[in-house]
Amino acid sequence: MDEFGGSFENRMRLPKLIIENIRKKAGDSLAILCRINATDDVEGGQTAQDAAAVASYLEKECGVDGLHLSRAVHLHDECMWAPSLIHGGFSADYVTEIKRAVSVPIITVGRYTEPQYAELMVAEGRADLVAFGRQSIADPEMPNK
């Protein structure tokens, strides 16, 4: 095992080096955001508690300005993204748990196809921003709704 594997500190070494290098070159005028996985949803995989520890480390030790939380979807080997039958906001509970561990803004994503659900996430303080990926492609007017 090298200096980047094994312990939590070792696994966080590479992200810390990358973030420090970006901050050194960009200065404080650029917000640094990190996208992390909220949970793996598989036995032995990363849990929301693990992700909360990573999020806290990225904020406190690396100085990130915000976090973008996604969620691995490994329901089947052939499924690497949320199937159309999964409800919008399927990561909301995990996002909420991780948000409690940090003070930086949290961006969430996850099949938000109806604007009211995205608005609810922000209104309830469960996230600070909701990102629309595929939905923006399918419906470019989504932000105007």
Predicted region positions:
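Flavin-dependent oxidoreductase catalytic cores
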Residues: 1-145
